[in-house]
Amino acid sequence: MNKIEILKSIKDGLKIKEEITRFAKEGWKSISEDDIQRLKWFGLFLRNPTPGYFMQRVRIPNGISFSYQIKALCSIAKNFGNGIIDITTRQQVQLRNLKIEDVPEIFTIQEGVGITSIQTGLDNVRNIMGCPVAGLSSKEKVDGYSQVKALTKYISGNSEFSNLPRKLNIAITGCSDDCIHAETQDLALVPAVQELGGNTVYGFNILVGGKLGSGGYRIATPLDVFVIPEDVVKVCSEIILLFRDHGSREIRSKNRLAFLIEEWGEAKFRKALQEKLNDKLTPSGVDLRSNQKSEHIGIYRQKQSSLSYVGLKVPVGRIHADKLQDIALIAEKYGNGEIRFSHSNSLIIPNVPDQKLGGLLQEPLVKEFTYHPSSIMKGLVSCVGIDYCHLATIETKSRALQVAKELEDKLPDTESINMHWSGCPAGCGNHLVADIGLLGKKIKQGNEVVDAVDVFMGGRTGIDPKLATKVMEDVPCDELAKVLQHMVPYHTREKMHPIKGKKYKRNWKKASLAIPLEESSSSEKIKPRNQNIDIKPLSYNTEDTVKILNSKGWKKNSNGWLEKETSYH
């Protein structure tokens, strides 16, 4: 039994709240190592880079919050933390540099405005994601937000769900836009329609077993189950309990739901679920998701008459509490006080009447966190990085901004593209489902150890999901913009997945991965790789690139680009 299972067997993580007042009086050094782990049941993480200071991960179901809640969080960040708030890829926020002495007061403030950090860490159901424009978009086929709220209420603080083998990520969406990365979730519900008793019924298809991070990557697979909205909590809770009772509890990197699905297979898992429900399961309906992808950044008409929502880009998701507090005031002035967080490190101000839209767009903060960023900045996502995460190998947020700004200058007319940074294999930046994914690492360059990345391309979620392929290794971050400058124009989303007629053709396999050969010595080290060539990802530092590529069938064409024509069947 691993050490986390041992400490859970001694005391349920939820019981640690009874000890927090004592910890606050005695200081962080009085907290045992086991209790440091148990504090994660309440979203408190003692970070190695900042001894004595905690990060708090706040649960915000579906990313939907209100101005009074945001103002409370901003006050906490300024008065008890370092004044910085990070918007995460799970639609929640993180506060930093908090002292255990202040936690009781922090909890009191948060409880007073209806927010909590309960079960946002370790072996629990994490913040449940949903479409950030649920209830607003005309593309919504079925109400997903109500199900997110109901399931969150059912599992939060419930000891039936406080001792899972590993964390469980859930997403529920009723929208046709592919915005929640359903295939990366342990459990996902996506909009579907089914004929039941001669009636057309809208509900959800269920996907299980997706994961990014340690232990390998896996795309969630259909369970062949359709569920009506009224049964979502019942069915999802039984899936969670199946995982609780049958998931492996040995090697931590092999304990996710994905490994139970791999061991049992979807058919056995479905049968076990049917037995627990004591009811016949309905087969999957027609998946109502489109091939379109949206970061929900921009100005969009709501399905409610004369109202719009405005999606603002917060570069790499980091914002000072003073500015977020002012945005909360803007949401009150021009909307109804709602603020929503998206999966792409951004925020949304909904319910803006037509007559107020012009005034909103003139606000200095709306111009700073713009609703019309460049294509490169719009799709930029980053994990926290080494500044605050002990797992990260490089600083991602500042690197991501630096590279993006360089590419903006060099490629002002670039088409839509997603560029995601992860600082370690845990993959919190979702680099494996991006057009271009960047995974941080350290490499030795001469006598120095420098920040570098492996480059992945062609990832996507949705009705035709695919994990990105590693195409290049060991690219120093200081030279990354120069490398990507030649990749981006030929590998934007439209280039990788061209649109033909009304259907979105996924014909990456028919396209060559073309990378230019510059005359500079550094460019000669760049190693492109076609998706289906049977060679390993090419090292940035390998010598004799052209010779190697020519031996594999790559040739320089009339435009000075390397490409390879490959037959596909």
Could you describe each region identified by the protein language model?
Residues 1-508:
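Peripheral terminal and linker regions in Fe-S/redox and tRNA-modifying enzymes
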Residues 502, 506-569:
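Append "and occasionally in soluble cytosolic enzymes with long acidic Gly/Pro-rich linkers
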